[in-house]
Curated annotation (Swiss-Prot):
Presence of keyword Membrane: no
SUPFAM superfamilies: BRCT domain, DNA ligase/mRNA capping enzyme, catalytic domain, Nucleic acid-binding proteins, RuvA domain 2-like
GO molecular function, one term: DNA binding
Catalytic activity from the UniProt record: NAD(+) + (deoxyribonucleotide)n-3'-hydroxyl + 5'-phospho-(deoxyribonucleotide)m = (deoxyribonucleotide)n+m + AMP + beta-nicotinamide D-nucleotide
Keywords assigned: DNA damage, DNA repair, DNA replication, Ligase, Magnesium, Manganese, Metal-binding, NAD, Zinc
Gene3D superfamilies registered for this protein in UniProt: 5' to 3' exonuclease, C-terminal subdomain (1.10.150.20), 6.20.10.30, BRCT domain (3.40.50.10190), DNA ligase/mRNA capping enzyme (3.30.470.30), Helix hairpin bin (1.10.287.610), Nucleic acid-binding proteins (2.40.50.140)
Organism encoding this protein: Rhodothermus marinus
Binding residues for NAD(+): 66-70, 115-116, 151, 174, 215, 332, 356
Thermal behaviour (record text): Optimum temperature is above 55 degrees Celsius. Active from 5 to 75 degrees Celsius. Thermostable.
Source species taxonomy: Bacteria, Pseudomonadati, Rhodothermota, Rhodothermia, Rhodothermales
Cellular component aspect of the GO annotation: cytosol
Biological process according to GO: DNA repair; DNA replication
Binding site for Zn(2+): 450, 453, 468, 473
Protein name listed in UniProt: DNA ligase
Active-site residue list: 153 (n6-amp-lysine intermediate)
Length: 712
């Protein structure tokens, strides 16, 4: 039967060309290609980058992640640096973005709104700073070490606000940096943007003319609520908060914009008349704050480059604590007269640079979908991907959650897909790039049988997951053994997933208690095990016998019993025998357990094989009693209280602080709510601090926490 492939759309052709170029620039040494090949590659890069710039800056509908765009732009810059004659007037390296649409009135910026050059690592920041130092030394006639202001790079829509005699007169998008779009009526609907600069006697009258530059953005919680509302009305949700902010500002109907929960941060100024402006960028931010503009509280001024780099490292690790998206840190030479001395190149200032975080999102090809069997028998689809770098690591597999997830997003084998990796979260496929489809993609369905043991898969009522319910499924036991030995359970050093698989598949370990029967000669039979490695593993296994009871409970893999639940159980039951004898009602009555978990625990202990396992572990010397440090705390101000931690504490790590709170009978939560009793605040706190202030929740520093714990 003859098949017909649907013609590709313009978006599909652009994505296909982009994907090919990304593979080329990742695989080829651009320093080694000859001029002819460089000319052809540069032409393709210009064409593709200009199309993406138009979609990003004008349509506010990007097709690819920023990291992919940046990689292609870097490649073009390298080629143009090697062969300067390849630079053309229409090269995206010579301009900020695309031309504005005709739907809004055009506004010419009094001073260009330039973009920023990117720094993709600490070395790039050092190179930028040293270049600034050299240029300033040449122009000042003496060496200088300029201070740097560091600001979070808010992921939103750039905006220029013009005030005349203190009254908002124009709000304009960046557009191409020279001309933007007049979105004044929409900007007036954003509560955070002053319509009139308030007169403050301490500050003096407002400037006769002032251009404030900043970013319109949407908070994560507001974005989630907006998408819920859109989906409830049957409308298409936004892909991310940046798109939501940009799409809301550029609505033709200001009444629609007024209903969108938009926010604003001011980060700089353009032309100013009728006022004295501080010479320091950091002090400009404070001045804008006094004028009534919202300014991000995390901006800092540093005298030393090492402190700047530490700030970048901190926010790379802690950005998820914020209630808004950031995609980097903007670094600026603080002294504004020196900014003027440094000047700008065609599309970016020399005195500023954007330190970009490792990409958390990328587009790659979905090669296949396989299924993985977990320790509880849950069977989940796993995406097999064309390898791509996301979040600083190469990703070749990602989670697809369950069959409903795949079907609801119409993810097909052969699709180009968007992959994200946020923080320590497992990489996941979030959506297909439908515009890139050729017609050759294949839908996927969950197999009927377990890939490990061949048993019929079962979907339980009310659940999205399928399960293998065979008690002798080999794949389940491998995962259970790996979990049992894991860092948060029995913490057996040297026993990762590969060793767990070897021990299970060789028949040396099954059930878990066999782990404590292993002998040196058993391990020496395994591939990769010499005597030293074998003895080290045996020592680690022996040491694990004395782990706290809560770790053993977690390691047993009882469904719904995580680390926190295991700790709660040990507070109530002094031994595993006491826990095994507890009724469902007794278990469900425990705060933080509930009826579903209670039934799961009771059912686990009813299984004869599980009861036999516990007896064997006891006979082999594994601790099954509550240790003194796990005992319930005596009455104290902390017992029963809920704590939330935010920011870096001066002496305690976050894990140490959490352990101290738990030992004293307190609980640690991940987010602030009206049920929170205390918020422990360290350096550079995140949005949890703001939320605590709004709710009037008591806040403690490290010393205050230690005093409450009776340790000071």
């Amino acid at each position: 039967m003859e098949t017909h492939t649907a013609p590709q759309t313009a978006e599909a052709r652009l994505l296909e060309a982009t994907h090919t170029l990304l593979q080329t620039v990742r695989q080829r040494d651009l320093e080694a290609i000859d001029r002819k090949e460089a000319e052809a590659l540069a032409a393709r890069l210009r064409e593709v980058l200009n199309q993406h710039a138009y979609r990003y800056y004008v349509l506010d509908n990007p097709l690819i992640p920023d990291a992919d765009y940046d990689l292609l732009m870097q490649a073009l810059r390298k080629l143009e640096a090697r062969f300067p004659e390849l630079v053309t007037p229409d090269s995206p390296t010579q301009r900020v973005g695309g031309p504005p649409l005709g739907r809004f009135e055009k506004v010419r910026h009094p001073e260009p709104l330039l973009s920023l050059n990117n720094a993709f690592g600490e070395e790039d920041v050092r190179v930028w700073y040293e270049r600034c130092c050299r240029m300033l030394a040449e122009r000042l006639g003496q060496p200088v070490q300029p201070a740097v202001t560091a600001e979070l790079k808010i992921d939103g829509l750039a905006m220029a606000l013009t005030y005349e005699n203190g009254v908002l007169s124009v709000g304009a998008t960046r557009g191409d940096g020279i001309e933007g779009e007049n979105v004044t009526q929409n900007v007036r609907t954003i509560p955070a943007i002053p319509l009139r600069i308030p007169v403050d006697p301490a500050v003096g009258p407002p400037p006769t003319r002032l251009e404030v530059r900043g970013e319109v953005y949407m908070r994560k919680r507001d974005f989630e609520r907006l998408n819920e509302q859109l989906q409830a009305r049957g409308e298409r949700p936004f892909a991310n908060p940046r798109n939501a902010a940009a799409g809301s500002v550029r609505q033709l109907n200001p009444q629609v914009t007024a209903l969108r929960p938009l926010s604003f941060f001011a980060y700089g100024i353009g032309p100013v008349e009728g006022a004295e402006v501080p010479d320091s960028q950091y002090e400009v931010l404070q001045w804008l704050g006094r004028l009534g503009f919202p300014v991000n509280e995390h901006a800092r001024r540093f005298e030393h480059l090492d402190d700047v780099l530490e700030y970048c490292r901190y926010w790379t690790e802690h950005r998820d604590e914020l209630d808004y998206e950031i995609d980097g840190v903007v670094l600026k030479i603080d002294h504004r007269p020196w900014q003027a001395l440094l000047g700008a190149i065609s599309n970016a200032p020399r005195w500023a640079v954007a330190y970009k975080f490792p990409a958390r999102e990328a587009i790659t090809r979905l090669l296949d979908i396989m299924v993985s069997v977990g320790r509880t028998g849950v069977v989940k689809p796993v995406a097999v991907l064309e390898p791509v770098e996301v979040g600083g690591v190469t990703v070749s597999q990602a989670t697809l959650h369950n069959e409903d997830y795949v079907r609801s997003r119409d993810i097909r084998i052969g699709d180009l897909v968007v992959v994200i990796r946020a923080g320590d979260v497992i990489p996941q496929v979030v959506r297909p790039v439908v515009e890139a489809r050729t017609g050759n993609e294949r839908p996927w369905r969950m197999p009927e049988r377990c890939p490990s043991c061949g048993s019929q898969l079962v979907r339980l009522p009310g659940e999205a997951d399928y399960y293998c319910v065979a008690s002798d499924c080999p794949a389940q036991f491998v995962r259970l053994l790996e979990h049992f030995a894991g860092r948060d359970a029995m913490d057996i050093e040297g026993m990762g997933s590969q060793v767990a698989r070897q021990l299970a598949e060789s028949g040396l370990v099954r059930p878990l208690s066999d782990l404590y029967r292993l002998k040196l000669e058993d391990l020496l039979k395994l591939e990769g095990f010499a005597e030293t490695r074998a003895r080290n593993l045996l020592r680690a296994i022996e040491a694990s016998k004395q782990r706290p009871l809560s770790r053993l409970l977690f390691g047993l893999g009882i469904r719904h019993v995580g680390k926190t639940t295991a700790e709660l159980l040990v507070q109530r039951f002094a031994s595993i025998d006491e826990l095994a004898a507890a009724t469902i009602d007794e278990l469900a009555a425990l705060e933080g357990v509930g009826p579903i978990t209670a039934e799961s625990i009771a059912n686990w202990f009813r299984v004869e094989d599980n009861r036999r396992l516990i007896e064997e572990l006891k006979e082999l010397g594994v601790n099954t009693q509550r240790l003194p440090e796990e005992a319930p705390a005596a009455e104290s101000p902390v017992r029963g209280k809920t704590f939330v931690l935010t920011g870096a504490l001066p002496h305690l790590t976050r894990k140490e602080a959490e352990e101290l709170i738990k030992r004293a009978g307190g609980r640690v939560a991940s987010s602030v709510s009206r049920n929170t009793d205390y918020v422990v605040v360290g350096e550079n706190p995140g949005s949890k601090y703001d939320r605590a202030r709004q709710l009037g929740i008591p806040m403690l520093d490290e010393d205050g926490l230690l005093r409450l714990l009776g340790m000071k």
